[in-house]
Amino acid sequence: MSAKRSIGDPEILKKRIPQNQKYQHVKTRLDTGNSMTKYMERIEEIKKNYRYKKDELFKRIKVSTFAQLVLQVASVSEERESGEMTADELQRLEDNSSVISDTEFLTDRPNGKGSPVSESKSPVQFIDSERGEEFIQTSRSTLQSVISGVGELDLGNQADKEKQSLPSSSALDKPYEDCPFLLLDVRDRDSYDQCHIVGARNYPTAMLSRTMNPFTSEILEYRNAHGKIIILYDEDERIASQAATTMCERGFENLFMLSGGLKVISQKFPQGLTTGSFPSTCLAPPTQTKSALKRTPRDPIVPAENKWRFSSQDLEIIENHVENMLMSTSTPSRLRLDSRNSKVPSSASSARSLSSTSSHSKPWK
């Protein structure tokens, strides 16, 4: 007897769908949730942009996490600076009704000149010593200020004049006070001058080969400090991973490496985080088509600015990019939540119907 043959080709499921290279970059707009295609795209992105290795001594920080950290540090520093101004004004209002003694005024000074060990001067001696020593101006209404004829109005006017004389860009030239992270660019000086993250300090890997003083004072200040971290980055993790491994072997426990480096930043945060022009190795190659007869000219190379803080425009751009990333990642979960919420009323209505039928079936007493 002959065996029964199945209808159709048994290899039909293994047949590959022909793909056209012309439409490879076109992606579907329909979000169907997690799929094998998205998983494979994620794996390809990791292989292309990241260099994960087994038994890494250092820890990693994502670009999106670093952007959120930048936004938090900027907001806290802004609140702190504005809070200091309001605290000075409140202190001035409180001190209008009380006059402190000279001993309290001298012992409140942070430097060593007015320590409690030193002798307290009388108001007359303080006035005489003003001409020979540096006079420290405060917003408090003290006895010697009243005697010398210096009022709070004069101090306020002088402070306003000093603020007006300072340029508006001076705030961007100073790093954030008490910043919780130290950002180090481990590339050479030329690459750093071309493009770097705002607020990053240049620390070439050649510094690690020194036998004497391989670390700067900033690195030693942040080394294993409580509540502070050190972040290294480069273009594509080739140099930063080696530098991070060496520093971890030398006792750094709060060291992180920025995953992906400038290559991932150019894709996810093309503006806002960096200053200058991205290197050509970080930019994606343009797609060439048959219809394109002329090549599009690239943007001219702009050198990096000497910025230590993010401007308000930069922070707004970074916040928009972060929101877009969070929206794209939360869309599948939001769809699942919507589907769950849509199922809840049906189950609740069925429970109500069962309870109503059971109540009607019971005899009334």
UniProtKB/Swiss-Prot annotation:
Entry protein name: Centrosomal protein of 41 kDa B
PROSITE patterns in UniProt: RHODANESE_3
Origin superkingdom: Eukaryota
GO cellular component, one term: centrosome
Localization: Cytoplasm, Cytoskeleton, Microtubule organizing center, Centrosome; Cell projection, Cilium; Cytoplasm, Cytoskeleton, Cilium basal body
Comp. bias regions, Low complexity: 342-365
Region feature (Disordered): 1-23, 104-123, 329-365
Residue intervals of the Rhodanese domain: 177-274
Keywords: Cell projection, Ciliopathy, Cilium, Cilium biogenesis/degradation, Cytoplasm, Cytoskeleton, Protein transport, Transport
Compositionally biased spans, kind Basic and acidic residues: 1-14
Function: Required during ciliogenesis for tubulin glutamylation in cilium. Probably acts by participating in the transport of tubulin polyglutamylases between the basal body and the cilium.
Gene Ontology biological-process annotations: cilium assembly; protein polyglutamylation; protein transport
InterPro entries referenced in this protein's UniProt entry, alphabetically: CEP41, Rhodanese-like_dom, Rhodanese-like_dom_sf
Designated gene of the protein: cep41-b
Stated family: Belongs to the CEP41 family.
